[in-house]
C-alpha cells in the first residue's frame, strides 16, 4: 500500500506531501522526492532525524533510541519508520527530545 506523507516545518519552510509505500522508510522516500531532512546514523540509534507524528501511525519497531514516553507523545525516527496510514509529521524536532 502507498500512503500520503505530509511533512511540515515552519522554521525550515517545509510543507510537502508525497507518497511512501508501506515497506519504504519515510526518510528514504523523502530523499527520493528531493526533500532534505536531517539524519546521521540511518539505523534508528540516534535522534538527528527525529520527527513528531501529529496524524496517522508509523511502524518504527527497528528503532533503539526513543523511550516509550517519547513514542507515546508521537516522536518518530524517520530513518527507520514505515508508514501504516496517511501521516502528518513535524520535522526537525530533535531539540524537543532534550
Swiss-Prot record:
Cofactor info, note text: Binds 1 [2Fe-2S] cluster.
Cited NCBIfam families: fdx_plant
CDD domains assigned: fer2 (cd00207)
Annotated GO biological process: electron transport chain
Keyword Chloroplast: yes
Keywords: 2Fe-2S, Chloroplast, Electron transport, Iron, Iron-sulfur, Metal-binding, Plastid, Transport
GO terms for cellular component: chloroplast
Protein name: Ferredoxin
Organism, scientific name: Porphyra umbilicalis
Subunit structure, as described in the record: Forms a complex with heterodimeric ferredoxin-thioredoxin reductase (FTR) and thioredoxin.
Gene Ontology molecular function: 2 iron, 2 sulfur cluster binding; electron transfer activity; metal ion binding
Family: Belongs to the 2Fe2S plant-type ferredoxin family.
Principal location: plastid
